[in-house]
């Protein structure tokens, strides 16, 4: 949301509480977060929200302007959104502490390898699709926002990665929106 430049009010709903689902259902018909309410429009799921914001704020640079670059970024964001289940199960998000030493099975290592391959491809072939910068498409974009939870997991669990992946993670972890997200955790 913040990347779009739109003003908004954030409603924080504590999770894992007896009334969490009831509270979430007030804003999201799927009972999942995040959700965006813009007047009479309700959008849930990260990808739906990003697409809505990209259409509403076309100059925000959420996606590349070139169709081929935009299609690649959307495909990778969708892969990130719906994939890497073994990694998500093995490496839970926890921005409050470090949890090194988790043993990685072949499925998790396969996810890590695929993510690094995506990041290498972005840095090699798509690095200036959204301007110049250290992020996947140059400037920080929706694609980096989609990978922020993975960056958080890799950071929390001190996953050994390639040099280019570490440099990318350092850039994401230093981005003001990521710093703000971590501080709010």
Which stretches of residues belong to each language-model region?
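GST-like domain detector, emphasizing the conserved glutathione-binding G-site
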Residues: 2-103
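Conserved hydrophobic residues forming the short capping helix/wall of the S-adenosyl-L-methionine
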Residues: 1, 54, 119, 123
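GST-like fold's C-terminal all-alpha helical module
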Residues: 82-174
